[in-house]
Amino acid sequence: ERWHPTKLRIGPDTLKTFSQKADQLIRLQENDLFFIDVGPIFEQHEGDYGQTYTVGSNSQFEELAAAARDIFIEVQGHWRAAGISGIELYKIAAHEAAKRGLELNTKMDGHRLGDFPHGLFHKGSLIDCSETPIQNVWVLEILLKDPKQNLGSFFEDILI
């Protein structure tokens, strides 16, 4: 069971947000990157996880894929240490992306999870949350754009 459809983004489609349609003609290449976003339901409680992967041996793709995960870990560390708001989390994420020559796409802006459906509990985004997000309830989403390669990378997980 899942609360949202599984999303697969390949190559140029890695720049697209969750709501944008994938290009059905894009195929995984020998050297490529892609991300998968899954939204399972476990015992009526929602989960959400997304990560970028690479195939082949392109070090630029590997660095881009790692950047989304690394920025997530960095931002989550600030949240754990200082108990900062969702607004501040995304300011830090944008700063960390810029330090790497990347851009943060804030249309993938984090959200609350809960008992299915989570929309009954909160309809806003993490990026607009002025309070400190509660662990195991909020999802931090990092969608990056590499303007040089015109590709993206994505990482999301529950703040724990």
Kindly give the residue locations of the regions a language model identified.
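Active-site neighborhoods and metal-handling regions in enzymes and metal-associated proteins
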Residues: E1-I160
